[in-house]
């Protein structure tokens, strides 16, 4: 029921009179839809940072890597290494310079998903910089040599 999902903690959108405001939760919900119908992709974590959460999935030739930086104050550097190098397709990142920011009727787009930066390629891995308090989805695609 839509009525139960509006104006409550962790709702996808809020109403304020005539206004319907998408929340950051909506953006996360939208970003994570790429995992529907996909298979979990196993991975090995080296030098695990307890403030970074990682999960990945694969659907056909598309690989999706989600990175969540739970630190309110520190950006994080992540190295992604694949057995066979896929091509980078796109990245989406949800963050705000102030983790306390929220969307309201006066500022409906203060915290919204943005196009993320392409990861740098160094040696044999992708180098990713995660903003503080951010959620990111990186989309890669298997290359012809991997199929």
Ranges and model annotations:
Residues 1, 30-37, 68, 72, ...:
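Hydrophobic alpha-helix feature that most strongly marks membrane-spanning transmembrane helices
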Residues 42, 48, 59, 74, ...:
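Ser/Thr- and Asn-enriched, surface-exposed coil loops between beta-strands
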Residues 1-30, 34-56:
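Aromatic/acidic polysaccharide-binding cleft in carbohydrate-active enzymes
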Residues 85-130:
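Acidic, Ser/Thr/Pro-rich beta/coil linker or hinge segments at domain junctions
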Residues 11, 39-42, 66, 74-79, ...:
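Extended hydrophobic-aromatic, low-complexity segments
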Residues 50-85, 91-94, 133-139:
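Carbohydrate-binding surface patches
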Residues 122-147:
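Beta-strand-rich recognition/accessory modules
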